[in-house]
Amino acid sequence: MAGDTTITIVGNLTADPELRFTSSGAAVVNFTVASTPRIYDRQSGEWKDGEALFLRCNIWREAAENVAESLTRGARVIVTGRLKQRSFETREGEKRTVVEVEVDEIGPSLRYATAKVNKASRSGGGGGGFGSGSRQAPAQMSGGVGDDPWGSAPTSGSFGVGDEEPPF
């Protein structure tokens, strides 16, 4: 939305994402990302951890289910979302205000890891995406060379063989 404060966080999940469902059946996952800056200490000549920033995050519907199935405690993630301030009252009657991130996109950081991504299948019918509250399992990629246009050697006569000139 216009005027929202967007933020991108790179950090580690402090615990496994918590999948819950609202009374209307919408999936929601809550998790915390710890982002710790690295600071160079000129006196010692080495890098040290700065003070960690802990941000509470939430993501909804199908994306929430994908997060719960894919990410675990300690995973390094990249999160993009909108900062939201929320006020509430504790059981003791104290007023509290928290700042949270409503997640738009999340994924594993591949800086120090690898990942195999499986596209989530869509059920038949219209709508796909955040509007549908149905749960879909990840589709298994066959991985066969016939299905992957990049998985085989170029055919004869294609660009890139020998001393050919580019086709443009």
Swiss-Prot record:
Q: Does DNA-binding appear among the keywords? A: yes
Q: Which SUPFAM superfamilies match?
A: Nucleic acid-binding proteins
Query: Which PROSITE patterns does the record match to this protein?
Result: SSB
Q: Name one GO cellular component term.
A: nucleoid
This entry's Gene Ontology molecular function terms read: single-stranded DNA binding
Q: Give me the stretches of Gly residues compositional bias.
A: 123-132
Which PANTHER family does the protein's record reference? SINGLE-STRANDED DNA-BINDING PROTEIN
Q: Where are the transmembrane segments?
A: none
| The protein's assembly and partners | Homotetramer.
Q: Which HAMAP family match?
A: SSB
Q: Which UniProt keywords apply?
A: DNA-binding
Answer whether the UniProt record assigns the keyword rRNA-binding to this protein.
no
What protein name applies here?
Answer: Single-stranded DNA-binding protein
Q: Which InterPro entries does this chain map to? A: NA-bd_OB-fold (IPR012340), Primosome_PriB/ssb (IPR000424), ssDNA-bd (IPR011344)
Q: Where is this region: Disordered?
A: 117-168
Q: Name one GO biological process term.
A: DNA replication
Q: Which ranges carry the SSB domain? A: 1-110
